[in-house]
């Protein structure tokens, strides 16, 4: 019995021992090679299962390394801690678990070179000298930190002092280099390496930020430009501020170089004093392989020519195992091009941060940075390489956050790659088949296997050699402010359906493509240095016919376009024909350039036109109108730049939109051309999906060959197509009192909604209509294509096919709408008697017959057809306010229609009324367009007396007394009545000007009097001005008072402008010129700033007593009211996101040389409490000022709680004061208490000057946030960070919090699933 128990105990001990050491097995190899250690790359990630060998094999250098003695109180490296340490020769050391050592390179009299340093505990390197090693292995749980440069030597290099010809070979080539197997590596240099620069002259540049002090160093830099993507060396001298560099002994800086980057490069062979190396930056030499859920942080490091993987087809090392012993390798087939030997190869690591680093490779490699199932945040870095890609993102890489990086690629020849690739793969397959005949257990290394069944490069995970910026298989990418130049594709996506074949994972979440999100904001792409082909893409997608779950894309393409194309299948050559016009798939044979701004996103499977079964002709329109674009963030401009013929003077642009309503509120749509608004906040309202067409004219006065068309919406209106027409001056059709339709409409849908009055017909005989369709249920998103939609001339023809059956009903509807809009007589206007010296035309009496109206019109020689004049974006003149009372006649107080009292009214066209007219509506020859502000427009009215009596005629024209937006220019001659003889005709001319954005839709009266009796009829004026920043005061409706500032008589209301909820800031006009100048300054600044984190300026308006500033409305209120007055408790991650958005906005303002002057939570508006998109925007620019040539502004009228010490000292308000105020606001948001509430308000200036800062609950704030706060409000203003630095730190903090939250939610979900499974099992058992 005892023997059986002992046997079981021994068996258990053996099992436990085997289990504990299963991850690290010793693999014996043939003579001449290192024995290998087998490492499970993802042993604890159960979702990854594979039938193939995915283990990692690295040289067994740690097993016999010298292990340190752990001596209490000794935490610094000394040789005596490692028994057997040889001070005269190479050593391999092992930092044991639970031990921590500090290596001070400069304090040691001897420079120690290590063959291997294995870290299972903690190892820190400090000092100014390089840390020289052959291999650094960070074991699971180990931690390595260094502020010194790391220099690698090759132990087999015959020139090296430690060369030993008996050193065995590393079959996989991990060393020299770094191997991280699940620990933490942090290599951070103190000084910046990469700088942005602007050209001053051929031999001088200005860099940003300024260089750090550089004393006694070899001042050599490498300059990268578009002409020289690999850079060139320069010596230099700098000014005292270290911003202006005078270049010596180098190539000139070309005027054509728009992108200039500067790198401080330090090499070992430079004559630099070791004590000064620290000041010039750190270099890292050696291939780096990171795996096993490691934590990675590199900052200000230089990775130079580390990559060994060439741009040739992969050829990996293969191990031939003994069929009788899984730990014995019988043969090694050495690979010639292993895929993981890039400068930096990272896999299965979700916490990777790279900041301010430089990657440089002038040899032809595959890529400097390769990611496999890893997430990375990379910022402020430079990647210049002669490679297939700057970055390759393989399976499972779910997130790349890239900001302010420069991706530079040298032109490469890819012509022979595909042929060589297939030949190589076929050879590899033959080798694999032969090997498999010998051993069924033949395995490849590191998930880098050539699959026998794969015979093309993509199926073998051999990709990214085409000349890409970022080549991606599955990640979500957020690119913000990056610069790409020289690539064939800036972003190249490849979706492969059978991931198990390629990733060797048979049961994995990677088997299905995940949702894709690509967001590109303010990034630029210049393909100047690529291979010269016209087929260059910012974004390219190759799906091989596979579908992803969903796709959320922002795209920007710079390739040439067809006039029209389909979007169903990019690889198809399908064409469809409408009336002989062809529409083709894709844009590979395009004719004419078109780009779409980077802040847009695609939506697929929009409601289909073909659902309208009564329109047999439009069945195929599904393929044209099933996709559309809109902005990522609400109310942000999406800009379409399209090519036109510079020799054609007049154009008509037609945009076709699909409205998918998200609620019952109207959606405002604004359209701009060349930065000039054409439609502003036009409300689109429907309860079901609707198509809307907008058409406008453009006069190409400057012979442009490309125009910018933009639109803004809250996100539920999609631009599905665009058509451009060249046009000529078209004379208006003959007008008659009674319009007779020329076409009979055919059957139309019964549910067609009322047409929007702003929609206009195209220049053809076929009309425009709206088509309403039912919204499709369960829309399944498809892969969005890489080409942003811009359908040109032929689209208009297709639209006409859709809509030609609605001509008469829409014409009547438009007319009825106009009449309804003008049916109300305005009161409170001054009476104007219109008098015009009559032009009497004698004609014979015609008893019982009507006058010939056609002849009346033919006599009118004043009708013209002015073409719309497009101006530049509204200048200061357009928004200029006046504090002088307007003296124009429209500011009267009498009733315009008071003289109509006791007069009999007749309907227009009544047979009993004695007069006839050539038109009922005065449109001032605009023909559907809008007039420009301040444009003088003219019209005339032919009046015919059809009676036998002479009449006295008065024309009573309405006036606008509220805002003065309507100015009657020839009012001085309308001061008395005139006579009109029987059967005579006269012409009355009208001239007026609209001085703001307004709709002048009014009735005017024609009053006739004879023999003591009076009668009148009404005609109409229908004029609308173009959109601008100067609004009509009467169209602004205030509803709810939000805030008031009584001393200055400033009030803030919630209101409405043309059915759009807005914030209205109303000022009372006073005699105080200073107060009025302040209002003008706020208007000027608002009109210039345009950023997603700054409240959107809609316009301003003025009447006799008040000025209004209108901005977008934040329904959540201010951040100050949210934290102090609301019962809602904000989470920590919400607060960080809100202040991150604010910091981004202030970064933009400071870059525009604008100081806000009044930063506090009350001036941060909350638009969304979600932690995605834009949550907070900056408002209230009453204290803002443009610095211009000045370095500071005078003390603002700001709250003392947020003013810094230097302002109280009288130094003026600078950018640093904004940073101080932001720090105080960040503190207030975190602790939710008014800053300085613990002291008397009047004591704040003195206490702040003495260095006192808010202390209440400061110690409860998160350490990272508290450091930001303390840096912001530090007394020395020169030490305060910039907002770009603040934004970066908040961005990193937010990303970490978001990652933790997602992990927590995933853990909770898994727990709930397991609990539910257990409950189900218990139920089954019961």
From Swiss-Prot:
<protein>
    <recommendedName>
        <fullName>Probable serine/threonine-protein kinase gdt8</fullName>
        <ecNumber>2.7.11.1</ecNumber>
    </recommendedName>
</protein>
<dbReference type="GO" id="GO:0016020">
    <property type="term" value="C:membrane"/>
</dbReference>
<feature type="region of interest" description="Disordered">
    <location>
        <begin position="731"/>
        <end position="762"/>
    </location>
</feature>
<feature type="domain" description="Protein kinase">
    <location>
        <begin position="1036"/>
        <end position="1292"/>
    </location>
</feature>
<dbReference type="Pfam" id="PF07714">
    <property type="entry name" value="PK_Tyr_Ser-Thr"/>
</dbReference>
<dbReference type="InterPro" id="IPR052015">
    <property type="entry name" value="GDT_regulator"/>
</dbReference>
<dbReference type="InterPro" id="IPR000719">
    <property type="entry name" value="Prot_kinase_dom"/>
</dbReference>
<keyword id="KW-0812">Transmembrane</keyword>
<feature type="region of interest" description="Disordered">
    <location>
        <begin position="833"/>
        <end position="858"/>
    </location>
</feature>
<keyword id="KW-0418">Kinase</keyword>
<feature type="binding site">
    <location>
        <begin position="1042"/>
        <end position="1050"/>
    </location>
    <ligand>
        <name>ATP</name>
    </ligand>
</feature>
<keyword id="KW-0067">ATP-binding</keyword>
<keyword id="KW-0547">Nucleotide-binding</keyword>
<feature type="signal peptide">
    <location>
        <begin position="1"/>
        <end position="22"/>
    </location>
</feature>
<keyword id="KW-0732">Signal</keyword>
<feature type="compositionally biased region" description="Low complexity">
    <location>
        <begin position="731"/>
        <end position="761"/>
    </location>
</feature>
<feature type="compositionally biased region" description="Low complexity">
    <location>
        <begin position="422"/>
        <end position="460"/>
    </location>
</feature>
<feature type="region of interest" description="Disordered">
    <location>
        <begin position="1301"/>
        <end position="1326"/>
    </location>
</feature>
<feature type="transmembrane region" description="Helical">
    <location>
        <begin position="783"/>
        <end position="803"/>
    </location>
</feature>
<feature type="active site" description="Proton acceptor">
    <location>
        <position position="1158"/>
    </location>
</feature>
<dbReference type="InterPro" id="IPR001245">
    <property type="entry name" value="Ser-Thr/Tyr_kinase_cat_dom"/>
</dbReference>
<keyword id="KW-0723">Serine/threonine-protein kinase</keyword>
<dbReference type="GO" id="GO:0050793">
    <property type="term" value="P:regulation of developmental process"/>
</dbReference>
<feature type="compositionally biased region" description="Basic and acidic residues">
    <location>
        <begin position="841"/>
        <end position="858"/>
    </location>
</feature>
<feature type="topological domain" description="Cytoplasmic">
    <location>
        <begin position="804"/>
        <end position="1326"/>
    </location>
</feature>
<dbReference type="GO" id="GO:0004674">
    <property type="term" value="F:protein serine/threonine kinase activity"/>
</dbReference>
<feature type="topological domain" description="Extracellular">
    <location>
        <begin position="23"/>
        <end position="782"/>
    </location>
</feature>
<feature type="compositionally biased region" description="Basic and acidic residues">
    <location>
        <begin position="1316"/>
        <end position="1326"/>
    </location>
</feature>
<comment type="similarity">
    <text>In the N-terminal section; belongs to the GDT family.</text>
</comment>
<dbReference type="InterPro" id="IPR011009">
    <property type="entry name" value="Kinase-like_dom_sf"/>
</dbReference>
<keyword id="KW-0808">Transferase</keyword>
<feature type="binding site">
    <location>
        <position position="1065"/>
    </location>
    <ligand>
        <name>ATP</name>
    </ligand>
</feature>
<feature type="region of interest" description="Disordered">
    <location>
        <begin position="419"/>
        <end position="467"/>
    </location>
</feature>
<keyword id="KW-1133">Transmembrane helix</keyword>
<dbReference type="GO" id="GO:0106310">
    <property type="term" value="F:protein serine kinase activity"/>
</dbReference>
<dbReference type="InterPro" id="IPR026237">
    <property type="entry name" value="STKINASEGDT"/>
</dbReference>
<dbReference type="GO" id="GO:0005524">
    <property type="term" value="F:ATP binding"/>
</dbReference>
<comment type="similarity">
    <text>In the C-terminal section; belongs to the protein kinase superfamily. TKL Ser/Thr protein kinase family.</text>
</comment>
<keyword id="KW-0472">Membrane</keyword>
<dbReference type="InterPro" id="IPR008271">
    <property type="entry name" value="Ser/Thr_kinase_AS"/>
</dbReference>
């Amino acid at each position: 019995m005892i023997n059986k128990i002992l046997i079981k105990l021994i068996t258990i001990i053996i099992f436990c021992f085997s289990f504990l050491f299963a991850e690290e097995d010793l693999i014996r190899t043939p003579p001449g090679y290192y024995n290998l250690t087998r490492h499970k790359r993802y042993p604890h990630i159960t979702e990854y299962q594979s039938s193939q060998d995915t283990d990692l094999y690295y040289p067994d250098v740690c097993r016999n390394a010298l292990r340190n003695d752990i001596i209490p109180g000794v935490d610094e490296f000394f040789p005596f801690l490692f028994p057997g340490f040889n001070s005269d020769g190479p050593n391999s050391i092992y930092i044991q678990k639970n031990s921590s050592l500090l290596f001070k390179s400069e304090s040691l009299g001897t420079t120690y070179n290590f063959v291997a340093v294995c870290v299972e505990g903690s190892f820190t390197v400090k000092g100014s000298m390089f840390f020289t090693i052959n291999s650094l292995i960070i074991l699971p749980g180990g931690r390595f930190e260094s502020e010194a440069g790391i220099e690698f030597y090759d132990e087999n290099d015959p020139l090296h002092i430690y060369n030993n010809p008996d050193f065995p070979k590393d079959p996989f080539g991990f060393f020299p280099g770094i191997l991280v197997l699940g620990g933490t590596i942090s290599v951070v240099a103190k000084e910046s390496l990469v700088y942005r620069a602007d050209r001053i002259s051929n031999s001088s540049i200005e860099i940003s930020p300024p260089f750090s002090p550089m004393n006694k160093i070899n001042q050599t830099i490498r300059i990268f430009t578009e002409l020289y993507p690999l850079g060139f060396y320069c010596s230099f001298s700098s000014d005292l501020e270290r911003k202006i560099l005078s270049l010596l002994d180098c190539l000139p800086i070309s005027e054509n170089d728009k992108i200039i980057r500067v790198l401080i490069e330090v090499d070992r062979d430079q004559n630099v004093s070791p004590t000064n190396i620290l000041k010039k930056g750190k270099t890292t030499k050696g291939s780096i392989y990171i795996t096993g859920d490691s934590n990675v942080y590199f900052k200000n490091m230089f990775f130079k020519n580390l990559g060994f993987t060439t741009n040739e087809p992969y050829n990996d090392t293969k191990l031939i195992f003994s069929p009788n012993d899984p730990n014995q390798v019988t043969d090694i087939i050495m690979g010639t091009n292993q895929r993981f030997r890039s400068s930096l190869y990272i896999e299965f690591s979700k916490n990777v941060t790279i900041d301010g680093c430089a990657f440089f490779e002038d040899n032809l490699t595959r890529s400097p940075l390769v990611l496999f199932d890893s997430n990375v945040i990379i910022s402020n870095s430079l990647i210049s390489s002669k490679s297939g890609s700057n970055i390759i993102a393989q399976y499972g890489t779910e997130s790349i956050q890239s900001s302010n990086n420069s991706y530079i690629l040298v032109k490469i020849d890819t012509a022979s790659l595909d042929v060589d690739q297939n030949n190589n793969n076929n050879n590899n397959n033959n080798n694999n088949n032969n090997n498999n005949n010998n051993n069924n257990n033949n395995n490849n290394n590191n998930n880098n296997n050539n699959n026998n069944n794969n015979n093309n490069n993509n199926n073998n995970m051999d990709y990214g050699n085409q000349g890409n910026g970022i080549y991606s298989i599955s990640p979500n990418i957020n690119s913000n402010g990056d610069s790409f130049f020289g690539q064939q594709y800036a972003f190249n996506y490849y979706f492969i359906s059978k991931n198990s074949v390629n990733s060797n994972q048979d049961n994995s979440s990677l088997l299905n493509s995940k949702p894709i999100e690509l967001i590109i904001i303010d990034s630029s792409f210049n393909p100047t240095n690529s291979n010269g082909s016209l087929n260059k893409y910012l974004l390219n997608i190759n799906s091989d016919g596979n579908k992803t779950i969903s796709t959320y894309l922002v795209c920007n393409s710079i390739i040439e376009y067809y006039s029209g194309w389909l979007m169903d299948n990019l690889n198809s050559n399908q064409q469809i024909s409408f009336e002989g016009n062809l529409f083709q798939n894709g844009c590979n044979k395009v004719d004419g350039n078109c780009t779409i701004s980077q802040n847009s996103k695609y939506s697929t499977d929009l409601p289909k036109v073909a659902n309208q079964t009564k329109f047999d002709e439009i069945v195929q329109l599904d393929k044209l109108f099933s996709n559309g674009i809109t902005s990522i963030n609400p109310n942000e401009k999406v800009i379409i730049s399209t090519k036109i013929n510079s020799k054609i003077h007049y154009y008509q642009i037609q945009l076709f939109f699909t409205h998918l309503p998200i609620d019952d509120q109207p959606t405002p749509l604004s359209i701009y051309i060349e930065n000039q608004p054409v439609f502003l906040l036009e409300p689109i309202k429907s309860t079901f999906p609707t198509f809307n067409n907008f058409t406008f004219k453009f006069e190409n006065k400057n012979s442009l060959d490309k125009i910018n068309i933009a639109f803004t919406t809250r996100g539920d209106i999609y631009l599905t197509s665009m058509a451009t027409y060249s046009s000529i001056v078209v004379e208006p059709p003959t007008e008659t009192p009674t319009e007779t339709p020329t076409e009979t409409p055919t059957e139309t849908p019964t549910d067609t909604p009322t047409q929007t009055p702003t929609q206009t017909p195209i220049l053809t005989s076929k009309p425009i209509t709206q088509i309403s369709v039912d919204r499709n249920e369960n829309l399944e998103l498809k892969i969005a294509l890489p080409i942003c939609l811009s359908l040109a001339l032929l689209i208009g023809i297709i639209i006409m096919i859709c809509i030609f059956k609605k001509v008469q009903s829409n014409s009547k509807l438009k007319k009825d709408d106009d009449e309804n809009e003008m049916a109300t007589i305005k009161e409170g206007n001054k009476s104007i008697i219109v008098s015009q010296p009559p032009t009497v035309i004698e004609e014979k009496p015609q008893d019982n017959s009507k006058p010939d109206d056609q002849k009346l019109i033919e006599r009118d020689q004043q009708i013209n057809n002015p073409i719309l004049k497009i101006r530049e974006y509204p200048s200061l003149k357009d928004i200029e306010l006046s504090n002088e009372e307007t003296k124009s006649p429209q500011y009267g107080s009498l009733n315009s229609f008071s003289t109509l009292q006791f007069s009999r009214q007749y309907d227009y066209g009544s047979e009993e009324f004695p007069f006839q007219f050539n038109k009922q509506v005065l449109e001032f020859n605009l023909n559907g367009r809008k007039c420009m502000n301040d444009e003088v427009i003219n019209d005339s009215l032919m009046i015919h007396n059809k009676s036998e009596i002479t009449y006295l005629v008065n024309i009573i024209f309405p006036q606008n007394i509220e805002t003065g937006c309507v100015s009657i220019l020839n009012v001085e001659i309308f001061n008395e009545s005139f006579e009109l003889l029987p059967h005579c005709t006269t012409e009355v001319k009208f001239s007026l000007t609209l001085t703001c954005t307004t709709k002048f839709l009014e009735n005017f009266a024609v009053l006739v009097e004879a023999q003591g009796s009076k009668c009148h009829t009404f005609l109409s004026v229908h004029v609308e001005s173009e959109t601008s920043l100067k609004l009509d005061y009467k169209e602004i409706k205030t509803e709810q008072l939000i805030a008031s500032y009584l001393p200055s008589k400033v009030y803030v209301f919630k209101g409405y402008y043309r059915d759009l909820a807005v914030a209205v800031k109303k000022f009372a006009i006073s005699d105080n010129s200073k107060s009025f100048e302040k209002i003008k300054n706020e208007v000027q600044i608002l009109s210039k700033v345009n950023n997603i984190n700054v409240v959107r300026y809609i316009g301003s308006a003025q009447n006799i007593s008040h000025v209004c500033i209108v901005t977008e409305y934040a329904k959540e209120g201010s951040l100050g009211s949210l934290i102090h007055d609301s019962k809602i408790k904000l989470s920590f991650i919400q607060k960080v996101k809100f202040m991150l958005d604010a910091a981004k906005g202030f970064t933009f303002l400071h870059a525009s040389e604008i100081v806000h002057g009044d930063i506090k939570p009350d001036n941060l508006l909350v638009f969304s409490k979600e932690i995605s998109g834009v949550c907070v925007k900056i408002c209230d620019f009453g204290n803002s000022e443009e610095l211009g040539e000045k370095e500071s502004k005078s003390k603002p009228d700001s709250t003392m709680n947020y003013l810094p010490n230097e302002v109280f000292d009288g130094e003026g308000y600078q950018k640093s004061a904004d940073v101080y105020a932001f720090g105080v606001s960040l503190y207030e948001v975190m602790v939710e208490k008014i800053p300085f509430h613990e002291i008397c308000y009047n004591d704040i200036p003195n206490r702040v000057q003495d260095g006192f800062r808010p202390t209440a609950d400061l110690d409860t704030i998160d350490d990272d946030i508290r450091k930001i706060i303390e840096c912001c409000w530090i007394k020395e203003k020169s030490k305060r960070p910039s907002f770009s630095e603040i934004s970066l730190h908040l961005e990193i903090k937010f990303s970490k919090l978001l990652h933790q939250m997602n992990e927590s939610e995933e853990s909770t979900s898994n727990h709930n699933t397991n609990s539910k499974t257990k409950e189900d099992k218990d139920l089954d058992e019961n």
